[in-house]
């Protein structure tokens, strides 16, 4: 095969992303491929501001924050064994995985 595989991990919980990235790197290194990463990408924060009351008190507001964490892993000189190991790998729910070949 010998092609570059790029894996992007995304989640709202940073510990899930880090554990998943560590699991992928350990699995790929066991098959003999070269791994670059996990590279942390910028954290995307969305802030929502809402009124505490439904009708009056405009000055009384509450803010909520939703952060998404991302990691990037590049795999070089992959073999069929590497791809099989990645297909069989079980990652926790709550982690979005995007793979580009």
From Swiss-Prot:
The keyword Transmembrane helix does not apply. Gene3D superfamilies: Ribosomal protein S10 domain. One of its GO terms (molecular function) is structural constituent of ribosome. It holds the Pfam family Ribosomal_S10. It comes from the Bacteria. Keywords: Ribonucleoprotein, Ribosomal protein. PROSITE patterns: RIBOSOMAL_S10. GO terms for biological process: translation. GO terms for cellular component: ribonucleoprotein complex; ribosome. Part of the 30S ribosomal subunit. PANTHER family: 30S RIBOSOMAL PROTEIN S10 FAMILY MEMBER. NCBIfam families: PRK00596.1, rpsJ_bact. Belongs to the universal ribosomal protein uS10 family. Involved in the binding of tRNA to the ribosomes. This is Small ribosomal subunit protein uS10. It comes from Parabacteroides distasonis (strain ATCC 8503 / DSM 20701 / CIP 104284 / JCM 5825 / NCTC 11152).
């Amino acid at each position: 095969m010998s092609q570059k595989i790029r894996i992007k991990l995304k989640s709202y919980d940073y510990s899930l992303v880090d554990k998943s990235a560590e699991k992928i790197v350990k699995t790929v290194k066991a098959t003999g491929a070269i791994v670059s990463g996990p590279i942390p990408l910028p954290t995307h924060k969305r802030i929502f501001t809402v009124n505490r009351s439904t009708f009056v008190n405009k000055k009384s507001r509450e803010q909520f924050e939703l952060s998404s964490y991302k990691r990037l892993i590049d795999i070089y000189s992959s073999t069929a064994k590497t791809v099989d190991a990645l297909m069989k790998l079980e990652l926790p729910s709550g982690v979005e995985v995007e793979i580009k070949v």
